Amino acid sequence: MDRPDEGPPAKTRRLSSSESPQRDPPPPPPPPPLLRLPLPPPQQRPRLQEETEAAQVLADMRGVGLGPALPPPPPYVILEEGGVRAYFTLGAECPGWDSTIESGYGEAPPPTESLEALPTPEVSGGSLEIDFEVVQPSSFGGEGALETCSAVGWGPQRLIDPKSKEEAIIIVEDEDEDEQESMRSSRRRRRRRRRKQRKVKRESRQRNAERMESILQALEDIQLDLEAVNIKAGKAFLRLKRKFIQMRRPFLERRDLIIQHIPGFWVKAFLNHPRIPILINRRDEDIFRYLTNLQVQDLRHISMGYKMKLYFQTNPYFTNMVIVKEFQRNRSGRLVSHSTPIRWHRGQEPQARRHGNQDASHSFFSWFSNHSLPEADRIAEIIKNDLWVNPLRYYLRERGSRIKRKKQEMKKRKTRGRCEVVIMEDAPDYYAVEDIFSEISDIDETIHDIKISDFMETTDYFETTDNEITDINENICDSESPDHDEVRNETTDNNESADDNETTDNNESADDNNENPEDNNKNADDNKENPDNNKHTYGNNFFNGGFWGSHGNNQDSSDSDNEADEASDDEDNDGNEGDNEGSDDDGNEGDNEGSDDDDRDIEYYEKVIEDPFDRDQDDYEDVIEIISDESVEEEEGIVEGIEQDEDVYQEEGNYEGEGNEDVWEEGEDSDDSDLEDVLQVPNGWANPGKRGKTG
């Protein structure tokens, strides 16, 4: 059915038979020849991925759509050489199209006009993707247009081929500039990153340097404050030292008097010391038998040194009654020794006897006269700080070693005879404990902060060095040792003199005290032979009142020393007290005592040492009990580590039980009024003579 808007159908012209039909149109002209373009260098040729992307773009422009890159619709000619691919398409009715051209194997002369019309940069550019489309001229109405794409941009250009009047469209895409731009941007980023890292490192170094500088500044400030405290502590110690020297002087004088009545005391003390006997030969032993006293004194000025004095009786070796060896510090701080020349009798010089005795060079008096030995300072320090402080423990060491050898022989005899031996006396028990404490003295380490020898002056020069001061607790341990607790006599008040001491014998023999000191030399042998007479052993006014009373005084002063030192343990004495104080070495002490700060600093010390003998007796008794309890625990711990026979252990248990009961019974009988005159020190090892017997 015809539509209403359409007109009548047009009449077609009929051809008569007389009219001949028109001739076939002429054959189409041959297709334009292939364009030969110069290939880019190899380094600028596109890669496979770029080639695929360019083909995809061309396909989109032709309207093929997304998907893999496809060639243009046929008929087309593909020219591919050196990584460059060109598509040539012609219209289906284009004149001059040839099957050889369609298949891509035809050859024709290149159109020079088209090549000349193209600009050189677009023809010989870098990585190119070229698409040629050739259509019929009638479809575009005459002239064709040429459009190119380059790095500059899209711009239409008209290329008129006067012969074929065909239109060619060339699309050029270049990606080299993008790659170079990306490389340049990556280099810029790396440079910025390196600059930032260098800047961070430089800032961190600056911060660390500033932090270290602030730390060092704080440390320097603390050190300055510490030096100021050390100066004050040195001044306080100086005053405290003078007080203690005055307190100890009577005890030292009393000790010297007692030692003079003991023949061969110093030679035994020297020989029993673990380090000094290397300098003593047999000839020195004979000379030391005439030694009556040994004194160690500090020099007058602060930090100048000290000297040792040896007092001798008349002897056949030399004429000196006193020989002195002095150690003085020079400007460099080194100790330089000087000694008095020894006036030897004819033929007694060590040099004259050197040919006959090879050990003459290892002599105490050779060391005394020689000032170039490297070990001279060390030996002098041992004598000053160890031997002279407590010579009694080294004097009693030989007895302990002899009893130890007897015990070993007794053990061998027991194992040989295979019989049980019952010890009837308690002397081995006493000597065992004595030997323990003698061994402890070998391993005692001297504390180099405070030395007792600095407080044990015998001269009137009280200015001292504060480079080394021994811990005063060492003296307390010495006074609490079993050698000192051998006698359980109750001493009178310290204000009474040694000759007026009235002692009460805890062994029930107050009337049996001997007034002759020579009879007391037999007490040790009587103790071994007659165990029943142990209660009459140590009853002598001389040793009990003078010697042991002095140890009681030493104990009192040691307690006060301990209390005073506990308050100043943390103080640091550098040994440069005199230099920091700015005091002159002329013996004047005004610089040390004139400031009010010093009085405030040592207020505690003066309160402690104002009158140590007038303190409350109840408080003093508590201190004594605490010290004695600690000493008992220490002794018990040491005794447990020694290998002894089972019988000896059994005896120790029996003795300890009975001895403690007797001591505490006596403590209960004493009244408060008696505490002023008598101080009980409960110690299970104090008096082995009061212990029971085993049998």
UniProtKB/Swiss-Prot annotation:
Modified residues (Phosphothreonine): 340
InterPro entries from the UniProt entry: NAP-like_sf, NAP_family
Superkingdom of the organism of origin: Eukaryota
Cross-link (Glycyl lysine isopeptide (Lys-Gly) (interchain with G-Cter in SUMO2)): 11, 163, 165
Region annotation Disordered: where it falls in the sequence: 1-56, 175-207, 471-603, 632-695
Tissue-level expression: Ubiquitously expressed, with highest levels in testis, adrenal gland, cerebral cortex, ovary, skeletal muscle and spleen. Present in testis, adrenal gland, cerebral cortex and ovary (at protein level).
Keywords: Cell cycle, Chromatin regulator, Cytoplasm, Isopeptide bond, Nucleus, Phosphoprotein, Transcription, Transcription regulation, Ubl conjugation
Pro residues: bias regions: 23-44
Biological processes per GO annotation: negative regulation of cell growth; negative regulation of DNA replication; nucleosome assembly; regulation of protein kinase activity
Subunit annotation: Interacts with histones. Interacts with CASK. Part of a complex containing CASK, TBR1 and TSPYL2.
Entry similarity comment: Belongs to the nucleosome assembly protein (NAP) family.
Name this polypeptide is given: Testis-specific Y-encoded-like protein 2
Gene, per the UniProt record: TSPYL2
